[in-house]
C-alpha cells in the first residue's frame, strides 16, 4: 500500500503527515494563530518566518509519531498552489530537499484538491463522482468531482469567501480572530430569526455573494451604536450564520439536482461549522460527508491523501515545479511533469 510523506504550508499552519492508503499514520500541525491574533489577520512575512522556524521540528515529530523511516516512504507530496507565495516556498524547499536527499519522487498538490481529499480520511470508501462544497477563508466554490483529479467548477463566490465574511463580521461584533469559530460558538446562544438579513444570492444559480450580507451586519451594528440602542450579539451572530448556511444549502441542493449526484462533500475550514454540519447533515435525498473535525482546517494529512491518489495514478512533479499564489482547481494537471497514459 502506498505511503506518502507530505508537507503543507500554504498559509499559517506548518504541517507534516504520513498517510498509508487512506489511513493517517502520523500528523503534526504547528499553528500560528496566536501570532497572527495580535494583528487580527495573517501577515505574509511573519507567516513565512514562522514556517522557517517550525518546519524542522514538525517534520522530525511526524516521523517520530509514525515510527517510520525514509525506507517506508514511497514519495514526497507538498502544497505548491494556491496560497501565500512566501509560505508555499518554505514547504516547497523542504519537500524538494527531502525528495532529492532520499531519492524519492515528488508530487505537487493543489491545496483545494487536498481539502477535497480530507473527506476520504473520514470515509475511506468514498469514490467519485460527487459534489464538493469548498468553504474556507479564501475560497467558496461548488465543484463537480467527476473522477479522481477531474474537476468542474459549477459556482464560486463573486466577492468575499465565506470564511472571510465570518472574520469581518466577527471584527464588527468585537469577537477577535479567527472569526469563524467565535461566531459559531456565539450563534448557539442566539435567535437565528432575530434579524432579517440579505442572502448571498446572485443571478447565476450556483454562485454566491456575501459582501452585501457583511455590509448589512456592519450597518445594523452601526445604527444601534449611533442610536445608543442595545444589540444582542448572539442574536446577530445567529442570524448571520443562518443566512450564510441557508444560502450555501440552497446552492448545494440546486447543484445536486443539476448533476444528478447523491453525495456532497463539504470541505475547507468552514466545514467545521456546527450550523453548516447540522443543516447539510439532516436526513434527506442526499448524503453529506464531512472531514474529521481536526482535518477541516489546513493540514498535511489531506495533502498526503491526495498525494496517494496522484502517485498511484502515475503523476510526478519536477524538482523545478514553481509555487503559485493562484491556480484554478481545473488546471491541476499543469503541476505534473509525468502524466499517466490514458
Curated annotation (Swiss-Prot):
SUPFAM superfamilies: Actin-like ATPase domain (SSF53067). It is found in: Cytoplasm. It comes from the Bacteria. It catalyses: L-threonylcarbamoyladenylate + adenosine(37) in tRNA = N(6)-L-threonylcarbamoyladenosine(37) in tRNA + AMP + H(+). Its EC number is 2.3.1.234. CDD domains: ASKHA_NBD_TsaD_bac. GO terms for molecular function: iron ion binding; N(6)-L-threonylcarbamoyladenine synthase activity. GO terms for biological process: tRNA threonylcarbamoyladenosine modification. Its cofactor is Fe(2+). Substrate binds at residues 134-138, 167, 180, 184, 273. One of its GO terms (cellular component) is cytoplasm. Its main location: cytoplasm. Binds 1 Fe(2+) ion per subunit. Fe cation binds at residues 111, 115, 298. Keywords: Acyltransferase, Cytoplasm, Iron, Metal-binding, Transferase, tRNA processing. Gene3D superfamilies: 3.30.420.40. Belongs to the KAE1 / TsaD family. Required for the formation of a threonylcarbamoyl group on adenosine at position 37 (t(6)A37) in tRNAs that read codons beginning with adenine. Is involved in the transfer of the threonylcarbamoyl moiety of threonylcarbamoyl-AMP (TC-AMP) to the N6 group of A37, together with TsaE and TsaB. TsaD likely plays a direct catalytic role in this reaction. This is tRNA N6-adenosine threonylcarbamoyltransferase. It comes from Gloeobacter violaceus (strain ATCC 29082 / PCC 7421).
